[in-house]
């Protein structure tokens, strides 16, 4: 009976793993920022452009990036775009 319970629990966990790994990737939202550590986003930099870039980074990249100290620079681009540069991000 214990073996059946362990097998069932393992099956459930393994079936959830692909769902966890693909969250956000189906729509192409999660991006690898490494090695350039730069990404272009829509919108303007405004006064808090660096923080806006950091928020976008956390939204579109792996949550484990929060474990490292990060600062970002925001550079305005044409057509309501901005370049986010986060040189202190640790690439794993």
Swiss-Prot record:
Disulfide bonds join 34-91, 45-74, 53-84, 72-86. The keyword Disulfide bond applies. It is found in: Secreted. Its main location: secreted. Pfam families: SCRL. Residues 1-24 form the signal peptide. Keywords: Antimicrobial, Disulfide bond, Fungicide, Plant defense, Secreted, Signal. InterPro entries: SCRL. One of its GO terms (cellular component) is extracellular region. GO terms for biological process: defense response to fungus; killing of cells of another organism; signal transduction. Belongs to the DEFL family. PANTHER family: DEFENSIN-LIKE PROTEIN 245-RELATED. This is Defensin-like protein 249. It comes from Arabidopsis thaliana (Mouse-ear cress). The lineage of its organism: Eukaryota, Viridiplantae, Streptophyta, Embryophyta, Tracheophyta.
């Amino acid at each position: 009976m214990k073996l059946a319970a362990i097998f069932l629990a393992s099956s459930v966990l393994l079936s959830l793993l692909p769902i966890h790994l693909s969250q956000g990737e189906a729509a192409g939202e999660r991006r690898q920022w490494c090695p350039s550590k730069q990404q272009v986003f829509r919108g303007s930099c405004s006064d808090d452009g660096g923080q806006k870039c950091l928020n976008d980074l956390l939204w579109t990249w792996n949550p484990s990036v929060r474990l490292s100290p990060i600062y970002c620079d925001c550079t305005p681009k044409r057509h309501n775009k901005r370049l986010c540069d986060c040189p202190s991000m640790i690439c794993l």
